[in-house]
Amino acid sequence: MISKINGKLFADMIIQGAQNLSNNADLVDSLNVYPVPDGDTGTNMNLTITSGREEVENNLSQSIGELGKTFSKGLLMGARGNSGVILSQLFRGFCKNIETENEINAQQLASSFQAGVDTAYKAVMKPVEGTILTVAKDAAKAAVNKAEETDDCVEVMEYTIAEAEKSLNNTPNLLAVLKEVGVVDSGGKGLLCVYEGFLKGLTGQTIEAKKEKLNTEELVHEEHDFHGVINTEDIKYGYCTEMMVRFGKDKRAFDEQTFRTDMSQFGDSLLVINDDEIVKVHVHTETPGEVFNYGQEYGELIKLKVENMREQHREVIRKEKLNHHSDEQEESKTVETAIIAISMGDGISELFTSMGATHIISGGQTMNPSTEDIVKVIEQSQCKRAIILPNNKNIRMSSDQAATLVEADTVVIPTTSIPKGIAALFQYDPSSSLEDNHSHMTTALESVKSGSVTFAVRDTKIDGVEIKKGEFMGLSESKIVTSNDDEFVTVTGLLKSMLNEDSEILTIIAGEDANDDISDKLVEWVESEYPDVEVEEHNGGQPIYQYLFSVE
C-alpha cells in the first residue's frame, strides 16, 4: 500500500508515463481518423510530455508541489498541436491543485485528476465528447469515487486506468467518425498510456525504451529546417512589388479579368484584391516601374513597395555562412508589430515574407511548432503587438496559448490553411490598429475555400469515400471528397466540388512532389471547364501536399 506521494515518487510516475507514451507514439499516430500522412497526435503528445519530463529531470524536488510547477511549465511551453495543448492543460490543473503540498494522499491524487479535467474543459472553446477530454473526465470521476473507499494511491490509480480504458473503448459510440473508421480516439489512447506509465512509476517499475530517448531539440531542428538550396541567380523575377491604386473617374474603367491578364505578363506570384474604390496588387517582377505605370492607368497610386529579393537572398546566404540558423535569424528580428506565419515550403515562406510577414516559423502538418517556439519569436522580436497566422487547425490552440504568455498585445487569426493565411495577410494594413486588422483579416477568411491533395497512408472508409493506401485524396477544407489512384482524376474531382458559377479566382500552390505535366494539364482543364475563373499559380514547395488550392 502507498498512502503518500512525494516529489521523488511523482517524478518516477512522470518519467515512466512519458516513456510509455513514447513507446506507443506510433500506435497513437496510427489511430488518427483521417488517413493523411500527418500522424500527429502521438507525435505531438510525445513531444509535449517529453518537454515536461526533461524539465522534471533537470529540476528534481522532494516537494510534489514544486515538482508539479516544474512539470506544468515544461508541458505548457512544449505543448504542440491540439492534443499536446489539452494534455498540458490537464496537468496544469492537476499541478495547480497540489502546488502548496509537500506530499499528497489518495484523495488529493483523485481531486487533482478532477481539477485537471476542469481546467482542460475551460481551455477548449467547443469541447467535443468522444475525445481525450471524455476519457480524462471519466477517469477522474472514477478516481474520486475510488478514493472514497480506499487510502491506497495504487488502488486509485489502478481503478482510474480501468475506467479510462472503458471510456476509451466507448469513444466510437460518442463520435460517429470514429465508428465509421473503426478506431478509438487517438488522444484518449495517448492519455491512457500516460496513466499506465504513472502506475508503473508509482509501484517502482521501469519501462524499457523501445527506441533511443527522444531528443526534442534534434527532432525539432530536423523537422523545422525548411531553408532551400535555391541559388540567387535562379530567382526569375527579382523584385517583390506591391501597389494600392485608388480608382479615378477620369481614368481607365476597371475590369478585373483584363487587369489580372495584363498584370500576369509582368511576372508571377500575382495576387489581386479589389473593392469598389481600390485595387491592391502583389507581384514578383523584373520591371516594377512598368507595374506602377500600368496601375496609374486606373487611378492614383496610394501605397507602393519594392523589395529586391535577390539582395535579400544574398543577405540570407551571407548570414548562413556565419553559421546563423534561419530560425534564429527570424527570432532575433525586432519589430513594432510582429506578423508571425506558420509555414511549410520555401515558396510559401517566401510568399508570406514578401506579403509582409515579419517572422516565419516553419511547421505544419507533420511538425506543429510548440507554444514555446511561438513565444520565443514574439519575445525576441521585442514587439509591442503581434499577429499570429497558425495556418493549420492543429496549431490554433498552441497559438492561443502563446498569446496568453507574452507581454505584447497579441491576436490569433483563425487561419486553418495556407490559402486562408495568404488571404488574411493580404488584408493587413500597417496603418490600422491591431483590433481593426484582427477584424478585417478574420473577415477575409469567409470568402476563401481551401482544398488540398495528398496521399492515403492506410485503407479506410470515411465521409462515405472508399480509400486505398497509396491513393491520392482530395480534401475540401478538412473533408475528404474524392480518392483515386490517378492524380489528375483526383485533382479535377476535388476542384469540381469547390468551383461553381460564383467562383472568380482559383489559386494553385504546387508542392515539392507536384508533377509539372499534371500542373500544366490542370490549368488547361480549368480554363476549358471554367473559362470565367482566373487562375493564379505559385510554386509553394510544400511537403505532404502535392497541391493546395484556394477558391475566391
Swiss-Prot record:
Domain named DhaL: residues: 8-200
GO biological-process terms attached to the record: glycerol metabolic process
Pfam families: Dak2 (PF02734), FakA-like_C (PF13684), FakA-like_M (PF21645)
Matching InterPro entries: DegV_domain_contain (IPR050270), DhaL_dom (IPR004007), DhaL_dom_sf (IPR036117), FakA-like_C (IPR033470), FakA-like_M (IPR048394), YloV-like (IPR019986)
Cysteine disulfide links: none
MF-aspect GO terms: glycerone kinase activity
Origin: domain of life: Bacteria
PANTHER family: DEGV DOMAIN-CONTAINING PROTEIN DR_1986-RELATED, PHOSPHATASE PROTEIN
Protein name: Uncharacterized protein SH1689
